[in-house]
């Protein structure tokens, strides 16, 4: 009888232990309502096959007054037009792969080089407001391309400070009427020259004015002064009943979409490939050509 009672106690203890929360955080904002749930995969084992197209790149430009803004256009044919806005790093051998990979999913991606036309070195600390106009004009330029056809709206994809350029282009420069969605990787959702307390505890007021669907990606180990404004901004948009979503990828930090091979991790690649597939589906569901 004692042996039996001891066995019962041991089983009860093991069950209770199994129910304990793990020591590491495994639940993130996207797990609250599980909007990402895929019943087709869970119940029938089906995984969506991503589109894969050979991409060609060509150069072009558009003007803002006397300044010519160079553009790289990544295209695999007559596909819907999307705009990509780079961040502080500019467009280089690593970051240009981001719009290229998006184009391979079946889009024509317009990637303006906002820095070189204005002789701005990469990694600028200060924010030049004229770049907001240049970013807004990229949307106009994209929708005027032959590939756009009768497409009335585009989606704007960005990363890091490009997320701020996109925010200002849509809200301050009035391009929301031409925009079907805002997608950004760890965007800088605050004026780059705002005081430290505002960088950490507040998001830019323009975030509350976003009316288009929003999708944001960031890593678990992103810098805190980016994480807090992003999550607060998403919460505010959701409270206003706007379509706003965020995914926090476990085990990665900033730059997971373009970190070079010598420092790249498997977690970086998993996050980059998953976010790319989700961004492509998000765009495809919102823009019509």
Q: Where do the PLM segments sit?
A:
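N-terminal cap/lid segment of alpha/beta-hydrolase-fold proteins
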Residues: 23-76
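The feature captures the conserved acid-bearing segment of alpha/beta-hydrolase catalytic domains
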Residues: 189-245
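The serine-hydrolase catalytic nucleophile loop
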Residues: 90-99, 228-229
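Alpha/beta-hydrolase active-site loop
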Residues: 126-146
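Conserved alpha/beta-hydrolase
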Residues: 103-119
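Short beta-strand element of the alpha/beta-hydrolase
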Residues: 79-87
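C-terminal catalytic histidine-bearing segment of alpha/beta-hydrolase fold enzymes
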Residues: 243-289
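Alpha/beta-hydrolase fold nucleophile elbow
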Residues: 148-160
């Amino acid at each position: 009888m004692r042996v039996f009672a001891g066995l019962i106690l041991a089983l009860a203890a093991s069950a209770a232990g199994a129910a304990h929360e793990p020591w590491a955080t495994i639940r993130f904002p996207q797990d609250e309502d599980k909007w990402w749930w895929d019943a087709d995969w869970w119940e029938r084992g089906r995984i969506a096959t991503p589109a894969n197209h050979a991409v060609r790149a060509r150069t072009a430009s558009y003007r803002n007054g006397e300044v010519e803004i160079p553009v790289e256009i990544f295209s695999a044919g007559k596909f819907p037009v999307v705009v990509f806005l780079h961040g502080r790093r500019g467009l280089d051998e690593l970051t240009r792969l981001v719009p290229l990979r998006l184009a391979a999913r079946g889009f024509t991606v317009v990637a303006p080089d906002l820095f070189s036309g204005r002789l701005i070195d990469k990694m600028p600390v200060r924010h030049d407001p004229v770049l907001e106009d240049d970013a807004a004009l990229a949307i106009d330029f994209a929708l005027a391309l032959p590939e756009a056809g009768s497409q009335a709206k585009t989606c704007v994809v960005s990363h890091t400070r490009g997320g701020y350029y996109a925010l200002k282009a849509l809200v301050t420069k009035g391009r929301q009427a031409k925009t079907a969605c805002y997608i950004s990787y760890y965007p800088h959702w605050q004026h780059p020259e705002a005081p430290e307390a505002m960088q950490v505890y507040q998001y830019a007021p323009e975030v509350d004015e976003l009316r288009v669907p929003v999708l944001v990606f960031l890593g678990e180990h992103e810098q805190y002064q980016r994480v807090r404004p992003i999550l607060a901004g998403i919460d505010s948009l959701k409270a206003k009943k706007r379509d706003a979503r965020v995914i926090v990828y476990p085990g990665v930090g900033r730059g997971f979409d373009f970190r070079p091979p010598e420092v790249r991790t498997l977690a970086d690649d998993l996050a980059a490939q998953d976010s790319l597939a989700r961004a492509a589906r998000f765009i495809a569901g919102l823009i019509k050509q």
